[in-house]
C-alpha cells in the first residue's frame, strides 16, 4: 500500500512548505541563490538548470504537460491560470513570470499539488518501481 501522506510530508521537507506564489529557484549574478517571484528585474537571476515556475509543494510547471495535469485531475479553472507557464523553462520561464507574476488561492494550490503528486506517483513512479520487482 502506498503511503501518499507520508510521501507528501517528505516532499514538503525537501521542497519546502506549500506556497501559493509562483517562483523560480535561481542563482544570482551577485552571488548566492534566491527564488525569483517576478516582481523585480530578471537581470540578476539565472534559473537553476531547467527550472520553471514552481508553486505548491515543488510543482515545477516547466516540467509539466497540460494533458497530464488534466488527466491527473487538475481543475480547469486552475489550468486556465497556470497555462501560460506550463512547459516554460529557464529564461523563458523567468520572462513569463516577470510579465505576469503567479498567485493561486490556497484551495487552488492544494488541488494542483495533490493532483500532480498523486498523478505523477501513480503513472510514473509506481509503474517504474513495479518493473524492478
PLM feature spans:
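Acidic, aromatic-lined catalytic clefts of primarily extracellular/periplasmic carbohydrate-active enzymes
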Residues: 1-133
Amino acid at each position: 500500500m502506498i503511503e501518499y501522506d507520508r510521501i507528501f510530508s517528505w516532499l514538503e521537507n525537501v521542497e519546502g512548505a506549500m506556497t501559493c506564489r509562483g517562483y523560480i529557484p535561481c542563482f544570482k549574478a551577485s552571488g548566492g541563490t534566491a527564488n525569483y517571484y517576478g516582481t523585480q528585474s530578471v537581470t540578476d537571476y539565472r534559473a537553476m538548470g531547467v527550472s520553471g515556475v514552481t508553486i505548491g509543494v515543488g510543482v515545477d510547471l516547466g516540467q509539466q504537460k497540460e494533458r497530464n495535469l488534466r488527466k491527473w485531475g487538475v481543475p480547469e479553472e486552475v489550468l486556465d491560470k497556470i497555462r501560460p507557464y506550463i512547459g516554460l523553462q529557464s529564461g523563458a520561464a523567468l520572462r513569463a513570470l516577470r510579465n505576469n507574476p503567479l498567485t493561486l488561492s490556497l484551495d487552488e494550490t492544494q488541488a494542483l499539488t495533490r493532483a500532480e503528486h498523486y498523478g505523477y506517483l501513480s503513472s510514473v513512479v509506481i509503474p517504474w518501481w513495479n518493473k524492478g520487482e
